[in-house]
Design a protein with these regions (language model features):
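A short beta-turn/strand-edge loop motif at beta-sheet boundaries
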Residues: 66-70, 128-129, 189-196
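Extended, solvent-exposed segments with strong compositional bias
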Residues: 95-115
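Low-complexity, Pro/Ser/Thr- and charge-rich linker/hinge segments at domain boundaries
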Residues: 154-177
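Bacterial Sec-dependent N-terminal signal peptides
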Residues: 1-25
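Short acidic/polar inter-strand loop motif in beta-rich domains
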Residues: 81-83, 127, 141-147
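Contiguous beta-strand segments within globular domains
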Residues: 36-78, 172-186
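Proline/serine/threonine-rich low-complexity linkers at boundaries of modular beta-sandwich domains
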Residues: 26-40, 159
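Ligand-binding face of N-terminal immunoglobulin V-set domains in extracellular IgSF glycoproteins
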Residues: 114-127, 132-139
Length: 198
């Protein structure tokens, strides 16, 4: 007669549970109905993709239609390539506090709908990012309940890429096709297998 639960099964269960705990994907949390106009965008460039170069600034802004000056806090979490929380401690990827209050807010006046507008710039006097990677920005209320999350990317340019576009040398395709050539200058960055890594 077989044992219903052996030491081997117990070890396998513990191992699987530990993988589940350490590889939890941080979900994108949708904001409640009173939170509107959420934007997370770079401050220097004129596009809305939340992607910045290491050392550049990104800004979060949103409106709370309750209009009652809530005490919101933010937390920045470093993630791996698959948006799983990384095992890196905050002191390795941040200078300053990983959580703090959102201190910049203004109440609307002379408007049909009352609201409070909140803004957060990163870096700020209390925090700066010192490591490239994927990040989750969490916003919580004064009861530490998660209100919403936003993802952003911080990158470090390690190679330069040049591109040139030329008309096709084939006469039949001269007006409809192009040749595109890329040049990757790796500098001191080591690439072992260009076919897979570029």
């Amino acid at each position: 007669m077989k044992k219903p639960f052996s030491k081997r099964h117990c070890f396998a269960c513990i191992l699987l549970m530990s993988f589940a705990v350490f590889s939890q994907n941080i979900e994108h949390i949708k904001a409640p109905e009173n939170i509107k106009s959420i934007q997370l965008k770079p401050t220097k460039v004129n596009y809305y993709a939340p992607i910045i170069k290491l050392g550049e600034a990104i800004e979060l802004s949103f409106d709370d239609l309750d209009g009652d000056e809530k005490n919101y806090t933010y937390t920045i979490i470093h993630c791996d390539y698959d948006w799983q929380q990384s095992r890196i401690v905050p002191t390795e990827y941040l200078n300053g506090l990983s959580s703090d209050n959102i201190r910049n807010y203004n109440n609307a006046f002379n408007t049909y709908q009352s609201y409070t507008h909140y803004q957060l710039g990163i870096p700020n006097e209390r925090l700066s990012i010192k490591l490239s990677g994927n990040y989750i920005l969490q916003v919580k209320d004064d009861l530490d309940a998660l209100i919403f999350t936003r993802r952003f990317v911080v990158y470090e340019p390690q190679v330069t890429v040049g591109v040139s576009v030329h008309k096709s040398p084939v006469i039949e395709k001269f007006n409809t096709h192009q040749n595109v050539q890329f040049t990757v200058n790796t500098g001191t960055f080591k690439i072992n297998n260009p076919r897979e890594e570029i």
